[in-house]
């Protein structure tokens, strides 16, 4: 099992009533772990106006992961960032002049973020607690363009969600100075 698969199982998997299931609106992540399950993925259609999601389920598979089980930190961190981070252009002022630079926000539980951030080529960041509609979460902000570039460069590899990385690469290109 790869670190990438371990992250999917840890972040999207749940053990319920003797069955282990993984669900996600993006089929890519379900397909990335489908080889670990004896059953085929299916689309769970929702009638309540919410998004449909893909599901893998098995009573014979119990793959709940812990951080101590991680074997491939680069793949694990890549998947955590894909699933729980937001990359955007942060509007702010430099010397009174408006500008927009890349900002990477990584969300999650404190223990997860502490372990993941220790594998980033960036200085230590303070965990910030944020209240959400479903409770409380933590976030790490990376707002230095150099740090964001270094982190994303260090995470490039396979497997990865190519659609997501194409969007992120395009966003990072918007920030490059002309020349």
Residue ranges and their predicted role:
Residues 1-179:
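Internal intein/HINT superfamily modules and their associated LAGLIDADG
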């Amino acid at each position: 099992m790869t670190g990438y698969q371990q992250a999917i199982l840890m972040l999207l998997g749940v053990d319920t009533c003797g069955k282990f299931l993984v669900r996600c609106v993006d089929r890519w992540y379900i397909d990335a772990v489908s080889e670990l399950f004896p059953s085929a993925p299916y689309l769970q259609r929702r009638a309540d106006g919410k998004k449909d999601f893909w599901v893998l389920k098995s009573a014979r598979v119990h793959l709940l992961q812990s951080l101590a089980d991680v074997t491939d930190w680069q793949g694990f961190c890549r998947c955590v960032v894909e699933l729980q981070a937001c990359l955007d252009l942060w509007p702010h002022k430099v010397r009174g002049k408006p500008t927009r630079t890349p900002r990477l926000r990584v969300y999650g539980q404190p223990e997860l973020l502490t372990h993941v951030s220790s594998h980033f080529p960036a200085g230590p960041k303070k965990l910030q607690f944020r209240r959400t509609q479903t409770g409380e979460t933590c976030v790490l902000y990376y707002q230095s363009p150099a740090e964001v570039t270094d982190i994303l460069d260090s995470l490039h590899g396979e497997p990865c969600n190519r659609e997501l990385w194409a969007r992120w690469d395009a966003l990072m290109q918007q920030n490059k100075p002309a020349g």
